[in-house]
A protein has these predicted regions:
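A short, charged/proline- and glycine-enriched loop
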Residues: 1-4, 297
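N-terminal Rossmann-like or analogous alpha/beta NTP/dinucleotide-binding catalytic cores
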Residues: 3-137, 286, 290
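Short helix-capping/linker segments at secondary-structure and domain boundaries
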Residues: 102-106, 141-146, 248-256, 286
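Residue-level signal for well-ordered alpha-helical scaffold segments within enzymatic catalytic domains
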Residues: 30, 70-71, 98, 139, ...
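A generic structural motif
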Residues: 12, 147-148, 202
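Conserved nucleotide- and phosphate/pyrophosphate-binding catalytic cores
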Residues: 18-20, 155, 161-327
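Classical nucleotidyltransferase
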Residues: 91-93, 103, 107-116, 120-170, ...
Length: 327
């Protein structure tokens, strides 16, 4: 029995961080052993908000690929590619835009949220409004059976389903209707207790050196009410302890929990222990990244091979689409 096909992507915004690891990447790594997976770098999507700052995008593409390889995504198990290399995405996006009602895009909750969040940017362009149509083209191009996303992206997949149904209604059953595979969002917060994000300048990156990690952990905001060493702490609301739960062994985490509540351990010592365990956990990822950083030709070959595999599938799909639309 053929494996179900999965597709997901990431915008190239720079090196990836722990939030990416415990959100998408951990799920992708498991999925590559169970499904036929297509994972792509959505560089065209980056233009919807960064159309006036495109210079870093090519470098960011390489950063993301290095991080993908370093965490264990394997080109032997999945297809890794760059969206803009597969020009068929643009053609399918154009055709889908012809049949997508404008109100579908205007009522998209993610669109409204991003307009509010990025209120200092001029986003009054079709590319930003039509972002979900390009996303639909990305997904149905590969006839994906499922799309792993966090709850915030679920409306986009639902819109993709509606667009696929509408295309099939007009032109025949060309596309399967993809299912939403809800994945658990990362619970890791940034150093300032907000969502970990490059834009907030609060992220710990997978490529950070041990010294940088130790420095960032030292800056972490914990519970400000614990003003004195003798004050008991509350691990339940402590950002540092949430990292212990992920990166320290169970015995250590339980010991930290008890000692913090009884004020037997201070925050500085707690942070140092956590930083050491985090550095140790990320060592294999950093080592693998270093391996690929010194072999740029190998990385370029992996990217090119994935691009070719993806485009072969896309060409076949577009032949079917053109025949169905009769153009």
């Amino acid at each position: 029995m053929a494996k179900k096909r999965i597709l997901s992507g990431m915008r190239p915004t720079g090196p990836l961080h722990l939030g990416n690891l415990h959100g998408a990447l951990a799920n992708w790594k498991e999925m590559q052993d169970k499904y036929e997976c297509f994972f792509f770098i959505a560089d065209w999507h980056a233009l919807t908000t960064d159309y006036d700052a495109t210079e870093p995008i090519r470098g960011h593409i390489l950063d993301v690929f290095l991080d993908w390889l370093s965490v264990g995504l394997s080109p032997e198990k999945c297809t890794l590619f760059v969206q803009s290399y597969v020009k068929e995405h643009a053609e399918l996006f154009l055709l889908l835009s012809m049949i997508t009602p404008l109100p579908w895009l205007e009522r998209n909750p993610t669109y409204k949220e991003q307009i509010a969040e990025l209120k200092n940017r001029d986003l009054s362009n079709f590319g930003f409004l039509g972002y979900p149509v390009l996303q639909a083209a990305d997904i149905i191009m590969y006839k994906a059976n499922g799309v792993p996303v966090g709850i915030d992206q679920a409306p986009h997949v639902e819109l993709t389903r509606e667009i696929a149904r509408r295309f099939n209604h007009f032109y025949g059953d060309v596309f399967p209707i993809p299912e939403t595979i809800l994945t658990e969002s990362s619970k890791i917060l940034g150093m300032d207790r907000r969502k970990m994000s490059k834009s907030y300048n609060n992220a710990i990156f997978l490529s950070d050196s041990p010294e940088v990690i130790q420095n960032k952990v030292g800056q972490m905001i914990y519970r400000p009410q614990r003003a004195r060493r003798a004050d008991p702490g509350n691990p339940d609301i402590c950002n540092v302890f949430s990292f212990h739960q992920l990166y320290s062994d169970r015995e250590t985490a339980e010991g930290i929990d008890a000692e913090c509540r009884e004020a037997k351990i201070g925050c500085v010592e707690c942070k140092k222990m956590m930083a050491a365990n985090l550095v140790k956990a990320l060592d294999p990822i950093r080592e693998k990244r270093s391996f690929y950083e010194t072999r740029p030709d190998t990385v370029r070959a992996i990217i090119e091979d994935g691009n070719q595999k993806a485009r072969a599938v896309a060409r076949q799909t577009m032949e079917e689409v053109r025949a169905a639309v009769k153009i």
